[in-house]
């Protein structure tokens, strides 16, 4: 007779004869075992039976106590798992990598939409103050300007994006304003109240729609025109990811490398360093422009991203220190508001990344704690000097 515990006429509890009814004591024993049993995956190397168990083998029945079934003598082949093996196991949800280099578009070239000089002039004005474009180099800026396409919005209350929809474009507002609505149910609902609560308004120079493109997620809000005669510029999803996100990741890596060289911040953890890198703001200066002025209160710390600059004391005509890519200055502004010890003047086109004291403290707390970690005693950088911090 077939002895499998799950076969016909078999006793799954092993103790009684075939076809017998299991008594209350046996059932009580099984319940006690289940209560005290530690669940172990059958694919783990230490899987086995409790020595006190009434079951003979790892799956009950007539299996031998000292010989494991052949399926357990070697690591299991994933392809041989039963069809129902993963039925109740958790599954993972994946999206596109946020790292643009993971995208494989070897032959990709940015689209180009012809524009008149008047359109280009308007577009440059529209994106001039947008933080997403502030760190782009000249080539990337030209690619963005070429890829953007004009979208006139002639009337009020036109839906540009709807909450819950898939994201396909990123938008820059050139003219007019747009209201933002969020429904707590996560999607646009039917009826006059279906858009949910108004949470904000986007004015000229602002932008929207980037989150759905960055995270491959549904639109998080509904955006409608708040007045007639609005103008948008739209950037397609692929160009957004390839140019804007690629430049963002490259800039973050560069800033993190710069921050590693700042003595004041050398003990930051990688996570703290990435937070600071994301908070840095890009500013540009033309040759001869003053970046910081001697005697002014110090509120920000600067990393020289590109270009060159010189430091001058008083009315001196000779530089007392030269700065190039990767150098930093003004870091003591993170500690106190003492006046600047020198003036820093751009000698070429310069791009700097700045971080204010308030932003630093908001992210990492008082800088004194970082300095105690760093043991910043007797360190002098740039043209600024400081009293050693007593620790």
From Swiss-Prot:
Dimerization and phosphorylation, as annotated region: 1-131
UniProt-annotated stretches for the region Disordered: 1-84
CDD domains for this protein: CAP_ED
Biased segments, Polar residues type: 38-55
Annotated keywords: cAMP, cAMP-binding, Nucleotide-binding, Phosphoprotein, Repeat
UniProt GO molecular function: cAMP binding; cAMP-dependent protein kinase inhibitor activity; protein kinase A catalytic subunit binding
Phosphoserine: residues carrying this PTM: 92
Residues annotated for 3',5'-cyclic AMP 1 binding in this entry: 132-261
Highest taxon of the lineage: Eukaryota
Binding site for 3',5'-cyclic AMP 2: 264-381
Gene Ontology CC: one annotated term: cytosol
Keyword Phosphoprotein: yes
Pfam families per UniProt: cNMP_binding
Keyword DNA-binding: no
Binding partners and assembly: Tetramer, composed of 2 regulatory (R) and 2 catalytic (C) subunits. In the presence of cAMP it dissociates into 2 active monomeric C subunits and an R dimer.
Record-stated family: Belongs to the cAMP-dependent kinase regulatory chain family.
UniProt-recorded name of the protein: cAMP-dependent protein kinase regulatory subunit
